[in-house]
């Protein structure tokens, strides 16, 4: 890799409808080279956002959760739907520096049933990208999952979600993120922040880390920083997720 590249992952909530100006303000303030989006379900919104924020290359598809915007030339992009998954994952092949980015949005909710689905989805994704696992690549997005050792504080949840957690045995398995670690991927946030909880959701009262970036362990040294975007202040109302930013060298 011959240049510094900054990659953002951002869940824009409800397709970003009516929030284009706020989202563009956040993205322009951070100025990433590439943005991977979740809940990017309205192509016309993504086109408008890309134009406003200054990204000539972009892709989204109606009904698909994942999309992207890029200032770097893109050789190709495609959506792949593993069997049984709720959302397709997005593959973006960047021309220079050569790398692949995989954007994903796993099933939501906190219950043993939804965690089983996420676990299935991530195993299917890893199987699907096997042919690329020897080259440099990143997996980023809204995993909707807890990492091993992280605390689930249900006091912040609505009553109906508390009930789901209670029915699941009063806690949630950590299989999804553990699968990534077992596959020899580095949890980028934890690489730089051993003790900081790294909460990304919700923006008005952060108490969950749902947004992750993973890199193959053998390429971990190429990642120079990981930031949870806290500014400009409008980030608190633009979406319910804080964006995350990974800097590569």
Give short role names for the model-derived ranges:
Residues 43, 56-70, 83-86, 115, ...:
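Active site of divalent-metal-dependent phosphoester/diester hydrolases
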Residues 13, 41, 105-107, 143-146, ...:
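Catalytic metal-binding/acid-base residues of hydrolase active sites
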Residues 4-13, 98-108, 140, 241:
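Active-site-proximal beta-strand elements of phosphoester/diester hydrolases
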Residues 1-52:
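N-terminal, active-site-proximal structural segment of metallo-dependent hydrolase catalytic domains
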Residues 34, 38-116, 120:
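Structured beta-strand-rich core segments of catalytic domains in phosphoester-bond hydrolases
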Residues 119-144:
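His/acidic metal-ligating clusters that form di-metal
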Residues 35-38, 138-142, 186-191:
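Active-site neighborhood of phospho(di)ester-bond hydrolases with catalytic His/Asp-centered motifs
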Residues 69-72, 91-97, 215-217, 237-239, ...:
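Active-site beta-strand termini and strand-to-loop segments that position acidic
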């Amino acid at each position: 890799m011959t240049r510094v590249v900054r990659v953002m992952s951002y869940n824009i909530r409800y397709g970003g409808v009516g929030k284009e100006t706020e989202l563009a303000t956040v993205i322009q303030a951070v100025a990433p080279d590439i943005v991977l989006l979740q809940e990017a379900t309205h192509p016309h919104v993504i086109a408008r956002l890309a134009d406003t924020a200054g990204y000539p290359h972009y892709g989204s598809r109606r009904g698909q959760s994942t999309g992207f915007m890029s200032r770097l030339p893109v050789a190709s992009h495609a959506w792949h739907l593993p069997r049984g998954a709720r959302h397709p994952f997005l593959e973006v092949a960047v021309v220079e520096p050569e790398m692949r980015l995989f954007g994903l949005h796993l099933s939501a909710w906190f219950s043993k049933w939804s965690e089983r689905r996420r676990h299935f989805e991530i195993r299917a994704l890893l199987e699907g990208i096997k042919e690329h696992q020897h080259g440099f690549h990143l997996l980023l997005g809204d995993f909707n999952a807890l990492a091993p050792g992280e605390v689930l504080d249900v006091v912040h949840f609505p009553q109906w979600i508390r009930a789901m957690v209670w029915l699941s045995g009063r806690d949630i398995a950590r299989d999804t993120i553990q699968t990534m670690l077992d596959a020899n991927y580095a949890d980028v946030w934890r690489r730089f922040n051993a003790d900081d909880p790294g909460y990304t959701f919700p923006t008005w009262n952060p108490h969950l880390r749902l947004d992750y970036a993973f890199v193959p362990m053998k390429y971990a040294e190429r990642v120079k920083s990981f930031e949870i975007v806290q500014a400009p202040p409008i980030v608190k109302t633009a979406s319910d997720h804080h964006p995350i930013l990974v800097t590569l060298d």
